[in-house]
């Protein structure tokens, strides 16, 4: 939850194909969520819950560009249904390309991230969200210290567009680069 009025950020793959989305808080309060927008290419979705008279606790964005290899990171999630699980590690790499497209370069962390952590926050030691936990690389299916998060600075821009327009607007340049052969040059 990133605002007191009930804006929720998660991964697109968490909500993809859902007919109904329910957000469950730590105190077991349940809210039906409205999908404001999603970006499958960046794997981000923005939801809205109506807090009614409930005061929501929310988190703030940090500056992911300030993170350096070796900085501490803290992941919170719901791995295997174990809600509120907190793990810690370090930033292992920045701007990691996983080959999933040109839109996001990931923060890599060795904080334990497992199935169920997707869409959860990756924090710095100041309690600011520096990333959205998104993926792991593992041959066993469990965490082996190769976790990846969408950097907050990338996510913030996408989240704002999803809130404003329901989709992400990207520029596109219709240019194709190819070698100039002798025949083509003539």
Where in this protein do the model-derived segments appear?
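Serine-dependent protease modules
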Residues: 1-186
